[in-house]
Amino acid sequence: TKNVPNSTQKTALPETLRVLMDRPGQMHQNGQYLLLGSASPRVMHKSESLLGRAVTLEVSGFDIGETGTDAHTVQQLWLRGGFPAAYLAPDDAVSTQWRTAAIQRHVSSDLPLLGMNAPAPLMTRFWQMLAHYHGQTWNAAEPARSLGITEPTVRRYLDYLTQTFMVRQLQPWHANLAKRQVKAPKIYFRDTGLLHALLGIRSLPQLLVHPLSGASWEGFALEQVLRIAQPDEAYFWATHQGAELDLLLFKDGRRVGVEFKRSDAPKLTPSMRIAMEDLQLDALYVVYPGQHRYALAQQVEAVPLTALLP
């Protein structure tokens, strides 16, 4: 196996590898290449060049299974995020400095290399605005008005951040119901450390009292659940009448709902009952940052985030 430099900066590498792989006499040899990159092959327009020759594996930052499950460790991962340099920094100030620099590097260097030609100050403002959408349904009209650009341009900016693994657009599930259901995706920063840097949150005390603390923890827990569960499909569900489900997972023929509550003792809510009935869930887990696992109703259970590890 041969290591290859970061493909985001080396845009000709996929074509080069294709030539190497297709050389006469190479067909039955075991040559393998590890192609690293910080963007989806789709956004690099290179997916066809290695079609049938490559397997794409998404590698995320640290998760609770790697850092540990004691309360202090989990809170540090939530605050600083999973990038190794940010998580392992000697203190919160150094971690914040690294994350702030990483954001500027992504805006000024990585995105332009991928064809994102927006001015860096404009893209930075967009990213800062997007931080306030974390955990909310997306509405392109508002940031478009604020930035003085068109809605298609705003959507293109969002798609670039999605394809570079900075943002997750969680798509809505549309059940066969006689109810008006939300059709726009929900926006989550995949790394809460970057989210906190954009929001100016530099320490755990600041995070715990911030107005977006609950939404931040929801996004953090959601990413952990997706890594642990490895579902076949994942969505959220919401109606215009107010019923909603944070996460709907499909795996091995089962339909499982997940709610996230940053509280010491979550309780069953009317929205959970509606989701159980309307979506015909096999189970519903209410994930929270506590220590005890307990039943809330039939097929509904409160589960500590750290208890989800196999």
Residue locations for each model-derived region?
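Conserved ATPase-coupling elements of RecA-like P-loop NTPase cores
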Residues: 5-17, 45-47
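Active-site-adjacent loop/helix micro-motif of nuclease/hydrolase catalytic cores
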Residues: 12, 264-273
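Conserved catalytic/switch belt of AAA+ P-loop NTPases
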Residues: 14-35
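Interdomain motor-coupling "hinge/lid" segment immediately C-terminal to the ATP-binding subdomain
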Residues: 30-31, 37-141, 166
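Short, polar loop motifs at secondary-structure junctions
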Residues: 38-42, 286-293
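Domain-level recognition of nuclease-like catalytic cores that cleave nucleotide substrates
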Residues: 61, 291-310
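Accessory nucleic acid-recognition modules appended to NTPase machines
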Residues: 92-252
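Active-site ExK catalytic segment of metal-dependent nucleases
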Residues: 255-264
